From Swiss-Prot:
This is Ribosyldihydronicotinamide dehydrogenase [quinone]. The enzyme apparently serves as a quinone reductase in connection with conjugation reactions of hydroquinones involved in detoxification pathways as well as in biosynthetic processes such as the vitamin K-dependent gamma-carboxylation of glutamate residues in prothrombin synthesis. The gene is NQO2. One of its GO terms (cellular component) is cytosol. It comes from Homo sapiens (Human). Pfam families: Flavodoxin_2. Zn(2+) binds at H174, H178, C223. Binds 1 zinc ion per subunit. The modification Phosphoserine is found at S80, S197. The lineage of its organism: Eukaryota, Metazoa, Chordata, Craniata, Vertebrata. GO terms for biological process: quinone catabolic process. It catalyses: 1-(beta-D-ribofuranosyl)-1,4-dihydronicotinamide + a quinone + H(+) = beta-nicotinamide D-riboside + a quinol. FAD binds at residues 12, 18-21, 104-107, 148-151, 156, 194, 201. Inhibited by melatonin, resveratrol and 5-hydroxytryptamine.
């Protein structure tokens, strides 16, 4: 939709990967719609994933006992966070939709993306106390997880060996994105692209592109325990 701003947070080492193809088609389709699309390519940026005292450029409030959450909250208020954090916060602040494109690692995100979440979504910027879940500071924004898996779709069902795919999404969709106030759109899961045929992979990319054509008409999921775990 013309005038909308989209941030794609992309976490894959290889530009020619299937994840890279999904990222590229999202850039192409959303740009075609007139959206302004920004990509944070975390590996290309060599993003620091570790949450350390180097994230604070000013004086620590308690240099004797370091508490990352307390210090980054204070640094956010004092505008003394490291520039790589504030650069990403600016991108999030300006975005109407944030898409996270990544391969599933151990039922979660790659370490570099976890580091992005740990460092960028700090108290004062993404949430506060009070000021979380429906009152989170990023309310009014949309978020979407576009995930690739190693296992097949059958493995990620209630009777499959890995359980329903919604189970592993709970900490990310509810505990991170919803906690920060995002309205969460249904995930885009591309199952087992490495063992899929070329025709099947093309179908996954085409399905993602087609979905993006009407993404602005979608309603967010009810980000509740019942949605993730209900029968």
């Amino acid at each position: 939709m013309a005038g909308k701003k989209v941030l794609i947070v992309y976490a894959h080492q290889e530009p020619k990967s299937f994840n890279g193809s999904l990222k590229n088609v999202a850039v192409d389709e959303l740009s075609r719609q007139g959206c302004t699309v920004t990509v944070s390519d975390l590996y290309a940026m060599n993003l620091e994933p570790r949450a350390t005292d180097k994230d604070i450029t000013g004086t620590l409030s308690n240099p004797e006992v370091f508490n990352y959450g307390v210090e980054t909250h204070e640094a956010y208020k004092q505008r003394s966070l490291a520039s790589d954090i504030t650069d990403e916060q600016k991108k999030v602040r300006e975005a109407d939709l944030v898409i996270f494109q990544f391969p599933l690692y151990w039922f979660s995100v790659p370490a570099i993306l976890k580091g992005w979440m740990d460092r960028v979504l700090c108290q004062g910027f993404a949430f506060d106390i009070p000021g979380f879940y429906d009152s989170g500071l990023l309310q009014g924004k949309l978020a979407l997880l576009s995930v690739t898996t190693g296992g097949t779709a059958e493995m990620y069902t209630k009777t499959g060996v890995n359980g329903d795919s919604r189970y592993f999404l709970w900490p990310l969709q509810h505990g991170t994105l919803h906690f920060c106030g995002f309205k969460v759109l249904a995930p885009q899961i591309s199952f087992a692209p490495e063992i899929a045929s070329e025709e099947e992979r093309k179908g996954m990319v085409a399905a993602w592109s087609q979905r993006l054509q009407t993404i602005w008409k979608e309603e967010p999921i009810p980000c509740t325990a019942h949605w993730h775990f209900g029968q």
